[in-house]
Amino acid sequence: MALSFHKRVLSAERYESAGIFDVNGDGIPDIVSGNYWYQGPDFKKQHKIGGVTAHDEYYDDFSTIAMDINGDGRLDYITGGWWGQTLRWRENTGDYTKDWPEHIIAQTGSIESTRAWEVDGDGEMEFVPNTPGAPLVVYKLIRDAQGKGTGKFATHKLKLSGRENKDQGHGLGFGDLTGNGRGDFILRDGWLEAPADPYNGTWIWHPDFDLGRAPSVPILVVDLNGDGKNELILGEGHAYGLSWWDYRIDAAGKRTWTRHEIDPLSSQYHDLQWVDIDGDGKNELITGKRFRAHPQGDGGDKDPYGWYVFKWTGESFAKHVIDFGPLGTGKGVGIHFAVADLDGDGRLDVVAPGKDGLAVYFNQGNA
């Protein structure tokens, strides 16, 4: 694999989250990041969204998840952050001369990042913030009889057996670890087995592993080796390391997990995606450094950095460097980067936000 990308810097702004969706309803993807959206197809025209607050060198904006929340046919987005301690949605009113109204969904505690997962099997995504010092809660958009969003949410604090639901810890994943078709939650120090009814049933705690001090959001759950059971892929969000984990089950039903290194020499792998970036029909791991994830104190925080494609070979991962170097040359991917076909050529492109600026990487295919 020899993927080629054309890099274009859109902005020096230091927002760490970005999303790709059609803001103005013209059928063309746009880029949303922080206080601005960039109009496709050339992304040269910048429109203000407004309202994103700064806290030292951070912005309180750690996700950009598109959904029509109020059923008006326009895509809004879900965000939240550490300082505001709220999960929020920003309303796309269609009037792009004014700031987008912000609506608080819930007081959550400090949010590391939020992800959308299909938790209850109804075909619609729910929202799950990773709140290291607060409970695991699922937020479900309430829809009307026509299936349109109402702008209101149901709050589901999960019932747990084997541990209290009061402190998630840093890191969160979701996927089927039992093979029964239900999504389980993966935390830093174990996993929660899903009941048949996720909101009224009891989730069973399995303290099977210790994934480190601050695993990534998300922790990916994928069947890497085709053995019919899912493995875990995770980065160290504030230290060195990128790894995958598999397990064996003994005669008594006990799971024993084994860690396999992917990249122990790079650090601050905070966001990961599992997509087919080279078009061969098989997914690859896309990730990179979250530049200045903490202002100081993280392992490798002053190293040269970049983002990478890791290709599964059947036994391990091969690392392909897409961008790398010191500040001004290399580029990280922030806390919530975005992947989609921006230019309609059938290839997935990458939008990389971060404190080191906002850049687009147009996928040129295999060189």
Please annotate each region the language model reported.
Residues M1-A367:
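Beta-propeller-forming repeat regions
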